[in-house]
Amino acid sequence: ELPVPENAYTCVAAGDRLAFGIYAPGDAAPDEENDDLYQYSAVQIQERDGTVVYRNDHAAVLSVALSNGDASAPTDWLEIDTYSDDGSSIEQTSLLNATTGEERSGFVVYLSAGVASFQSENGTYQLVDLTSTGQSEVLCEFEDPISAYAPGVAVTYRQDLGDYELHDLNTGDVLEVRDESLGTNTLAVYAKDGTLRVYDQNTGAVLTDTVVTPIEGLQRTDLYNVDGGWVWLRQYDNDDYEATTRTVCGPNGTNKTLDLDAIKARYGADFHGYLWPVTAAGGEFYFSVSYQGPGRNWLYDLIDSTGNVVLAGLGSCNGYYAANPLPDGVFVARKGFEIGWMDLHGQWVYCQNIFYSSGDDAENYYF
């Protein structure tokens, strides 16, 4: 049995030590204990035998690894939010290494691969390696906020211009970026010169490297990182929500722009305009198209990136949670009175009747 401080309301394992959030330190009057959690909250780190090695009143604690859901995040670093005496505002956010005792102030955000962003006292933004031996190490420094990182590259956000820059940390080259998108351990960027790349955020490997020429009169883009090196780029030459072109790019040089006119012609007035990436398999990407069928009911077709219909007349057709993806070529679908996971041949991998219900089952958006 491990010793637990009185009034502890949370506990985080950090290396071989335990960090506790403690409610109502001794300076809180009994009738004030419920007024403000952060006014009467402290962080205490201790050995497993109960020996206290760190204490910070008016503070809250978070695990960097758990709060980011990143398996590569170091587990011995903790985020410490220190509040003002009245608990109304955060005075300082720092990262504390519970093992070594190192505390670094100015924490902004954890990025990936053991690297976080900090703001220095002079206002610059630093890439800091939290996994370096002995003590954290500043890798480089920028004038603008750092929005994303993969080993070998960093993306900064130019606040005055509202766009981004991709920095090659090995060569010093800088690429002006129109849009960026983060997936599950992947970073996608679309540059103003048409370069489109996807990086693995754990290794820095380039998963996709191609060119999509910007359309004439381009006003804005939407870039969707759908993981595995696949990206879905929509370009607009207007201020409306109607995309001018929609391009899918992926590993092995895949670069296809869907023929929207042909798709609209196939469905006519019943076409809803909904076109969304669903799954990838065998070097091909698949999308769902929504349209109104008999009785004005919504139906969905699964099409490939050439526009060919693979499966038709589904009651629903969409992807799954990015953090818990289905196998390649499997997606969430409804057909008739069955709902579940379907493959590209229309066969159920798993399904259940839509009328199935049990009070013991946890409710979920899909099942």
Please name every model-derived segment.
Residues 1-367:
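Residue-level detector of conserved, function-critical positions
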